[in-house]
């Protein structure tokens, strides 16, 4: 059952954000929509919203336990999350540990190559422009971040990566890469926002060497492999088994 909420603030490809009676809090509803290639590919997968909401909840709690502040406040229902209000930075932060996806299209690095160190790529959040890659000069030109803010984002992103990589390893999972969004709350604190789920991460199963079977994330949808919900469910199952 949906919790009480106010008017719709924003609807994206995978979530809706609603006002609440507290001006410092929002309610986020995770949708069952599956999209890829900037929503050029679209489907409805019953139960996907609930899986992403629960997985994000567990990961946000993990980060909080490790001293990394997030916008998460409470899981209100199976696909509803109460979060702090933040001013989201219009930048997508992608941390890469293993070469995959666009990195392999833009460089000669072979898919599956372990990178010598985590690579941080920044992208402008703009669907019309299809989220172009940003350079430091472009960030300065667009006045998106100060130098100190860029350094803080990098520091925080790498902390998240260290925490998630170690956690995933304990679940026999490999964190290939993932997307983060961040924002500032009313006190000016930088928080991890949005979601961290198989929609925003590439996660491989270390229990198999099969290049298709090991995929447990949205690449199953992108590549028409089927079993999208089964992959997401397996990630949640391992998280819950670890926490029990």
Swiss-Prot record:
Superkingdom of this protein's organism: Bacteria
Enzymatic class: ligase
Functional pathway: Purine metabolism; IMP biosynthesis via de novo pathway; 5-amino-1-(5-phospho-D-ribosyl)imidazole-4-carboxamide from 5-amino-1-(5-phospho-D-ribosyl)imidazole-4-carboxylate: step 1/2
Cross-referenced InterPro entries: SAICAR_synt/ADE2_N (IPR028923), SAICAR_synt_PurC (IPR033934), SAICAR_synth (IPR001636), SAICAR_synthetase (IPR050089), SAICAR_synthetase_CS (IPR018236)
Keyword line: ATP-binding, Ligase, Nucleotide-binding, Purine biosynthesis
Catalytic activity: 5-amino-1-(5-phospho-D-ribosyl)imidazole-4-carboxylate + L-aspartate + ATP = (2S)-2-[5-amino-1-(5-phospho-beta-D-ribosyl)imidazole-4-carboxamido]succinate + ADP + phosphate + 2 H(+)
Recorded GO MF terms: ATP binding; phosphoribosylaminoimidazolesuccinocarboxamide synthase activity
EC number, as in UniProt: 6.3.2.6
Entry's Gene Ontology BP terms: 'de novo' IMP biosynthetic process; cobalamin biosynthetic process
Protein family per UniProt: Belongs to the SAICAR synthetase family.
HAMAP family given in the database record: SAICAR_synth
Name of the protein: Phosphoribosylaminoimidazole-succinocarboxamide synthase
Organism from which the protein derives: Prochlorococcus marinus (strain SARG / CCMP1375 / SS120)
